């Protein structure tokens, strides 16, 4: 009789249990989790060859609801439940609503979502609807929605605001930096990521800084935050009244985490830059076709920023770079299908298929 085979690896417990000693979680709190975190860090071979750097992709679209938001939401909803709050509320361009709705459903509490009129990808809205969220469309943009959410939760303290202004969101999201250092053995030279409401760059810098402070990592990365050119307040230094970009997840004109994002950029000797929609879409197609990673357009801003920064010399060849790709491409299928070539039927004949493929 053959010996029993050992498990290939231990099951991932979710990020709260994995990093409990580094999170502000009470011992008696009931954890609200969908086993988020533990996402892969994939070596991007062809983008590495293109840039002359060693590039890794932190693929956050493989979190339970398809985006990095789940990292913060597990901690924020766990804390809200511990405080006995009756509902959670968020303003959202899409991913936050999907995540908040899922974790509220898991916790057995109400979720309400304020969305800007006509400014949300349908895949994300479908998730929130399926998880039972109460969807409220606001005649305004994301910034208007967030201001309304702030006022509402201030007036009704039984409702928790779970946007990234909630510090527990930042605590959960910082764990992605822990995972990167755990995988690489130290921090990368450069960490590139998209910037919208700016909570994520704040969280990554917090995570890297804590690991460095405690001697887990012997260095800190330079933070490279890329905004869409039509929604680039951190680049221009002024709020954008009517932000516009195909990258809906970062279509934000006045980031809630503005000050902490600037601190992360300055303390890390990093930079903010703007990428046009054309540059973002080029990176979106590049990562899908050369690395097999399908991301939503906003996610590709990190790669667009890297390409621009290699071109202008800010990122030196030979650097180790991590690009966070924040959301799954299935969040926004409409963008992927735009410009799709006309499909013409072929006969039920192997030679016809071979000819269509251009093979011999």
From Swiss-Prot:
InterPro entries: Ser/Thr_Dehydratase, Ser/Thr_deHydtase_PyrdxlP-BS, Thr_synthase-like, Thr_Synthase_bac/arc, TrpB-like_PALP, TrpB-like_PALP_sf
Keywords per UniProt: Amino-acid biosynthesis, Isopeptide bond, Lyase, Pyridoxal phosphate, Threonine biosynthesis, Ubl conjugation
GO terms classed as biological process: isoleucine biosynthetic process; L-serine catabolic process; threonine biosynthetic process; threonine catabolic process
Reactions accelerated catalytically: O-phospho-L-homoserine + H2O = L-threonine + phosphate
Binding residues annotated for pyridoxal 5'-phosphate, in chain numbering: 95, 196-200, 326
Pathway linked to the protein: Amino-acid biosynthesis; L-threonine biosynthesis; L-threonine from L-aspartate: step 5/5
Cofactor: pyridoxal 5'-phosphate
EC assignment: 4.2.3.1
Gene3D superfamilies the record matches: 3.40.50.1100
Per UniProt, location of the Isoglutamyl lysine isopeptide (Lys-Gln) (interchain with Q-Cter in protein Pup) cross-link in this chain: 151
Modified residues (N6-(pyridoxal phosphate)lysine): 69
Entry's Gene Ontology molecular function annotations: L-serine ammonia-lyase activity; pyridoxal phosphate binding; threonine deaminase activity; threonine synthase activity
Keyword Lyase listed: yes
NCBIfam families reported for this sequence: thrC
Family indicated by similarity: Belongs to the threonine synthase family.
PANTHER family listed in its UniProt record: L-THREONINE DEHYDRATASE CATABOLIC TDCB, THREONINE DEHYDRATASE, MITOCHONDRIAL-RELATED
Description of how the protein assembles with itself and partners: Homodimer.
Function per UniProt: Catalyzes the gamma-elimination of phosphate from L-phosphohomoserine and the beta-addition of water to produce L-threonine.
Protein name: Threonine synthase
């Amino acid at each position: 009789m053959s010996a029993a085979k050992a498990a290939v690896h231990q099951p991932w417990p979710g990020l709260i249990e994995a990093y409990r000693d580094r999170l502000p979680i009470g011992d008696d709190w009931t954890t609200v989790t969908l086993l988020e975190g533990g996402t892969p860090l994939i070596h991007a071979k062809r983008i590495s060859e293109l840039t002359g750097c060693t590039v890794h992709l932190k693929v956050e679209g493989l979190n339970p609801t398809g985006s990095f938001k789940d990292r913060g939401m597990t901690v924020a909803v766990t804390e809200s439940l511990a405080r006995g709050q009756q509902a959670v509320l968020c303003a959202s361009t899409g991913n936050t609503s999907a995540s908040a709705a899922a974790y509220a459903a898991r916790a057995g509490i109400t979720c309400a979502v304020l969305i800007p009129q006509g400014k949300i990808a349908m895949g994300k809205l479908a998730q929130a609807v399926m998880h039972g969220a109460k969807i409220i469309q606001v005649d305004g943009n994301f910034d208007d929605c967030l201001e309304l959410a702030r006022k509402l939760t201030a007036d009704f303290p039984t409702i928790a605001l779970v946007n990234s202004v909630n510090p527990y969101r930042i605590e959960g999201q910082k764990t992605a930096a822990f995972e990167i250092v755990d995988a690489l053995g130290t921090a990368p030279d450069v960490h590139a990521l998209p910037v919208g409401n700016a909570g994520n760059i704040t969280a990554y810098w917090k995570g890297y800084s804590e690991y460095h402070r405690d001697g887990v990592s012997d260095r800190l990365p330079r933070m490279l935050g890329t905004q869409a050119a039509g929604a680039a307040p951190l680049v221009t230094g002024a709020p954008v009244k009517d932000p516009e970009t195909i990258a809906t997840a970062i279509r934000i004109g006045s980031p809630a985490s503005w000050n902490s994002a600037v601190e992360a950029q300055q303390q890390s000797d990093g930079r903010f830059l703007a990428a046009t929609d054309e540059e973002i879409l080029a990176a979106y197609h590049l990562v899908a076709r050369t690395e097999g990673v399908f991301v939503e357009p906003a996610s590709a801003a990190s790669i667009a920023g890297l390409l621009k920064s290699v071109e202008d010399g800010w990122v030196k060849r030979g650097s180790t770079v991590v690009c966070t790709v924040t959301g799954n491409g299935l969040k926004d299928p409409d963008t992927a299908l735009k410009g799709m070539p006309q499909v013409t039927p072929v006969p039920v004949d192997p030679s016809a298929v071979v000819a269509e493929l251009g093979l011999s």
